[in-house]
């Protein structure tokens, strides 16, 4: 798993991994998952 430059919560990474996506961070306190994180 490649590490992101910014630190993301492990819960976010784990919930996104279930969808086979990457955690891009939190949006309104909710995990924001995407295949590609922009910027």
Swiss-Prot record:
Coiled coil: none annotated. Keywords: Amidation, Cleavage on pair of basic residues, Disulfide bond, Knottin, Neurotoxin, Secreted, Toxin. Disulfide bonds join 12-24, 16-33, 23-37. It is found in: Secreted. Expressed by the venom duct. The modification Tryptophan amide is found at residue 38. GO terms for molecular function: toxin activity. The keyword Transferase does not apply. Its main location: secreted. Residues 1-5 form a propeptide. GO terms for cellular component: extracellular region. The presence of a 'disulfide through disulfide knot' structurally defines this protein as a knottin. The cysteine framework is VI/VII (C-C-CC-C-C). Belongs to the conotoxin O3 superfamily. This is Conotoxin ArMSGL-013.
């Amino acid at each position: 798993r490649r590490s992101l430059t910014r630190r993301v919560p492990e819960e976010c990474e784990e919930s996104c991994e279930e969808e086979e996506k990457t955690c891009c961070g939190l949006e309104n306190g909710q995990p924001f998952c995407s295949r590609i994180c922009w910027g």
